[in-house]
């Protein structure tokens, strides 16, 4: 495992992926896999006896993971990068780093509404979903029951993203 910075620059990642900047990335031999859902399928192919796509629930867990990776992730971005959260953040060591990050994000999302969500809406969805998950996880070890599935991994990265600075 290689640890990389949470925010750009990520020179080791960029060299490995030829410019792809998102994480996670999986390297198996000379092959590079980008995108969580693709990586999970590749790993699942290596260990089919412990699939994170249970045969009896593959459609529902795939749909839930997609919702989590898109809608909940969008809410996570809004919650994680609200001004109040950034004020005491260790990610941004100084004002210059914060300004560079914001300029990078503006360039990355230019002309797109894919990663934007109004903060009040994001907080409402985040709180509601996390409350439901907390209740469900008080009765089972994993979102899907007794064993982890793709939804657990998709949810984990959203939580990690929001709580990275509070650990």
Q: Where on the chain are the PLM-derived regions?
A:
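GST-like domain detector, emphasizing the conserved glutathione-binding G-site
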Residues: 1-100
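GST-like fold's C-terminal all-alpha helical module
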Residues: 72-167
């Amino acid at each position: 495992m290689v640890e990389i910075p949470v925010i750009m620059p990520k020179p080791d990642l960029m060299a490995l992926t030829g410019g792809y900047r998102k994480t996670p990335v999986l390297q198996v031999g000379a092959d590079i896999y980008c995108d969580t859902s693709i990586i999970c399928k590749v790993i699942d192919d290596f260990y089919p006896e412990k699939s994170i796509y249970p045969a009896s629930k593959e459609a529902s867990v795939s749909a839930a993971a997609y919702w989590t990776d898109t809608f909940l992730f969008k809410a996570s971005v809004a919650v994680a990068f609200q001004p109040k959260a950034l004020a005491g953040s260790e990610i941004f060591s100084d004002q210059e780093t914060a300004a560079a990050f914001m300029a990078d994000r503006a360039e990355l999302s230019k002309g797109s509404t894919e990663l934007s969500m109004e903060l009040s809406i994001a907080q409402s969805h985040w709180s509601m979903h996390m409350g439901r998950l907390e209740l469900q996880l008080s009765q089972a070890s994993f979102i899907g029951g007794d064993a982890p599935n793709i939804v657990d991994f998709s949810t984990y990265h959203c939580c990690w993203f929001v709580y990275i600075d509070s650990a």
